[in-house]
Each structure stands twice: as C-alpha cells, then as structure tokens.
Amino acid sequence: MAFRFAGLLVSITCLLMSHANASGEAQKRWERMNQIRQEKFDLVLPEVMRENDVDMWITVNREGFDDPLTEDFGKGYVGSYGYYVFTDRGEGRIERASLGVGPALVEDNGAYDIIGNADDLNAFVEERDPQAIALNYARNIGAADGLCYTSFQKLSEELGAKYAERYVSAEKLASDFRSRRVASEIAAFAWAGEMSRNIAERAFSNEVITPGRTTLAD
C-alpha cells in the first residue's frame, strides 16, 4: 500500500512539474509576442503608414471571424464587432485603439493607448477626421484581405458616406508591416530555429531510431 501511495505521489509530482513547465513556456511565449508587438507598433507602424500615405488603419473583427492580422494585433474576444484602429496624429508614434475587443488580453499586452466600445467608432473617427482610411481588402495578398463584405457594409453604415469615399486598400501597408522585422522578432526566429534543430536531431538519432528495426509507421 505504501509503495502504491509513493508511486501515485511521484506520478502526481511529475504531472504538476510538467504542467508548471508548460505554463512557464506559455508565459514566456506570451511575453515574447507582446515585446515583438510593442516594438513593431513603435518602430515599424509609423514608418509604413507614412510611406503608404495612410492616416488611419482600421481592422474589423466579428464574432467567429477573425482577421488574419488579429494575432499580430493582440487577439481578444469580440462579441459582435470589434475594431483595431491605428491613427497617425502627426506625432512620433501612432495612436493605437481597441474598440469592442474583450479587454483582458488587450490590457495585458500593454500595446494600446485607448480601449473602448465598438459603439464609439463613429465619434472616434469623426474626432480625428482622417483623409485616407486603410481597410484590409486586397487583390493579391490573402493575409491582407480579411475584411468580409458584411463587415465592410457594417463599417460603411457606422462611418457614413463621407468616410466611405476615403477608403483605400491596406494590401501594401499590411505586407510592409508584417515583412519588416524588429530585433525581438529576429531573436524569436533564431530561438524557433534552434528548437526545430533540436527536435530534428533527436528524431533522427539512435535514441529514437533503431537501425534495421524502426519503420516509417513508427
């Protein structure tokens, strides 16, 4: 009985340690992604918005249908509609707003200046009066084509005809934003490459493969 209890205790301890390690790794990945996002918002976003002559960039999410750029912007739950809005107000940095996106993840990532409701969008845009509003529709790049027709209609109803005339494609803007790397992003790629190398080395080692016995089915 004592041996059985000891064995159970060891199993539980190993399970808890494994869970703690997994949680620790998840936390590290979250912090790494937050750092990358912050650096890209600080360093890349002002550059690419100004190069593409864009005053405001709006990304629309709706429940069950996330834009491909959502991961880049920080995720967060959307109940009906939600908007990530980036505005060039003529200062060094770009103003970042999250409207209608569940605040938990957005607040935790620390990248946004304004967190509000989706119903605030019209007043928010009116106050800033942008001349060029980039939206995620594109002919060639799928990752920049996340705005569905229904969301486009919803946005146009919210903003009215005045601003509908100022829409431009965010295709090149989104491509530029994603393709320009920051230091923390390069470091993350290096870390991922090293992890892949370690996995491949073990997968093809004698620790896993027994010559003459191991098959593809194994």
Regions found by a protein language model. Name each.
Residues 5-6, 167:
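A residue-level detector for conformationally permissive "hinge/kink" positions
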Residues 212-218:
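Short, intrinsically disordered, charge-balanced linker/junction segments flanking boundaries
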